[in-house]
């Protein structure tokens, strides 16, 4: 081997080792972040501001939920004042006699959970169970003290002590002492247990779904005490849940409302996101809510989980292209077609 060949071989060997190291660093990076666990004062744990300095990347990305830009496809999104009743006027007739015929707006980001709830025209006459998922105050204070008693309180009384900073925040999904994901919505825990699933003994990957699923699901309020329950017993597809209601398994609950014109008992699917996911190809592949809606990001060499809970088409590189080999344009076109076929 000539001297030049030896030099070239040496350069190639160094490059192989260097790039191999880079690839290993990227691929083998742990799923959790390397952020050190911070001690949050107990009297500040239900708020958000106390976590700001300890977890700046997560906090700053969470505040991006204030974004009200439209969806990349033009359907849905978080724009203030966008009404389903305007976009789909047939809903006014479909929901006649029900409060959703009065106001039914597009969801805004989680940072608006408190203000949008307090300002909805559907609020009068509701009970405390309506804010079970809006703040961890409901669990960490009310439920720990007196179980489901809060569920039957007038809504004004139940939400009165909740400070502005204590609506949906870090402790809604994380144990404030350990920052581990926590599944604590008792109605969800009980409903999954009836299916033989102990959600708090689940794998970390499953918890990345359950932490969202405990609130993003179909639910109803038990007639006896107002507690939250879920129609999961017979299965998670729409037909199984409908059969649950029809068979009298719902503990005295029979309908969401009586239609004003037809007088027929009616059911309204709330937001069965968990069930839609659980019966999907993504769930079969082990892909969770977090993988698509809160993907891993990197900033200044730090890997972290984005807490901007948003449309995956706004983070296509991180959310979709880690698995899909199609282009971003192809994936968007596919979603666009589904939206067009649904709403046009």
What are the language-model segments listed below?
Residues 25-99, 143-166, 172, 177-291, ...:
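Primarily the internal scaffold of c-type cytochrome electron-transfer domains
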Residues 13-26:
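Hydrophobic alpha-helical membrane-insertion segments, chiefly the h-region
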Residues 81, 91-131, 162:
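Long, charge-dense tracts
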Residues 127-136, 173-176:
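Long, hydrophobic/aromatic-enriched structural stretches that serve as scaffold segments
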Residues 1-16:
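N-terminal Sec-pathway targeting helices
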